[in-house]
């Protein structure tokens, strides 16, 4: 089924088209949810909620960009909204904002296996993990992140810097990374 046929069918609430859309995009979108979630079950819940929104908002897609990108934005916003409902997420952002932490200069480790990086990202505190995902992986600006998370732009920047440093430390500790402070792009591996 072509993407156009899927879109047309989904607009008519045809179950076959909805199933095709879900089967085509759910694996990639589950990976997005998994980067934000605490566990696989939470990621699957976010995915289901996100696709419900995709189907209910199908009439708003205007063919001005990639359909997959439109779905991804809905899924990311669904993940963020779920995290914002989570008290631990808000407390994490408040604690980090209140306690300034000195971090080393920006450093970028060498390219490692994407799966290993994703697993290490999941170890990060939820506030760090969320900002890192949004900025480095999803490509949002710090201004957009500050709007999404209701935080200051400077908080987004500091969360991102601290997340990168903490992630580098985790990668070194797990012996996934052996040379700290290499100037190569390693987050590209998880996009």
Regions found by a protein language model. Name each.
Residues 31, 45-52, 65-77:
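Structural recognition of an alpha-helix C-terminal capping motif at a helix-to-coil junction
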Residues 97-122:
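Acidic, proline/glycine-rich intrinsically disordered inter-domain spacer in sigma factors
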Residues 11-12, 48-66, 85-87:
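Sigma70-family region 2
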Residues 7-31:
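A short, charge-rich alpha-helical start-of-domain segment used by transcription regulators
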Residues 9, 91, 147-148, 164-191:
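C-terminal edge and immediately downstream basic/flexible tail or linker adjoining helix-turn-helix-like DNA-binding
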Residues 59-63, 73-93, 110:
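Arg/Lys-rich amphipathic alpha helix in sigma70-family domain 2
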Residues 119-130, 138-155, 169:
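Helix-turn-helix DNA-binding module
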Residues 22-40, 57, 121, 173:
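Amphipathic, Lys/Arg- and hydrophobic-enriched alpha-helical face
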């Amino acid at each position: 089924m072509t993407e156009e046929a899927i879109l047309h069918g989904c607009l008519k609430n045809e179950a076959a088209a909805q199933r095709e859309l879900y089967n085509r995009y759910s694996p990639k979108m589950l990976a997005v949810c998994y980067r934000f979630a605490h566990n696989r079950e939470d990621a699957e819940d976010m995915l289901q909620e996100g696709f419900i929104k995709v189907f209910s908002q199908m009439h708003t897609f205007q063919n001005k960009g990639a359909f997959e990108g439109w779905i991804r934005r809905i899924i990311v916003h669904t993940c963020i909204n779920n995290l914002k409902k989570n008290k631990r997420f808000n407390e994490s952002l408040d604690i980090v904002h209140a306690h300034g932490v000195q971090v080393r200069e920006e450093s970028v480790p060498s390219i490692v296996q994407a799966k290993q990086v994703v697993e290490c990202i999941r170890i990060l505190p939820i506030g760090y993990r969320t900002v890192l995902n949004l900025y480095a992986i999803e490509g949002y600006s710090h201004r957009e992140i500050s709007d999404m998370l209701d935080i200051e732009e400077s908080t987004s920047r500091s969360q991102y810097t601290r997340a990168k440093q903490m992630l580098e430390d985790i990668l070194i500790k797990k012996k996934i990374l052996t040379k700290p402070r290499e100037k190569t792009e390693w987050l590209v591996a998880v996009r």
